[in-house]
Amino acid sequence: MSDIELIDSHCHLIFDNFEEDLEDVVLRFRSRSVKKLVHACCEFSEIPKLKKISHEFDEIYYSVGLHPLEAKKWEPSSKSTLRRSAQEDRRVVAIGELGLDFFKSENKTQQIEALIPQMELAY
């Protein structure tokens, strides 16, 4: 397996269950040929911590965005906040986590209002 280099394109490393052992998590993925990871940002408050860990560990990159279940947090200034975050840090490699999620939520209008500007940034 050492000849194969893996990239995890969607992970969540700053959730509470990793807070105490992030360094151990890094050692485990390194030992399993995972060369890069992209943490999918769910809300704006995660961005400073994502920036910090991505600069601590060379393998970690991240996206900036707002998960559809957090769409109520979208504000008129949100698009410029995401744009600035993406432009300021070379470790940002995507916009998201974005989309529509009607499984747990009925805020369809809010989700669409948050989705469109994020898609514009990603384009």
Predicted regions and their residues:
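Mid-domain alpha/beta scaffold segments of enzyme catalytic cores
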Residues: 1-123
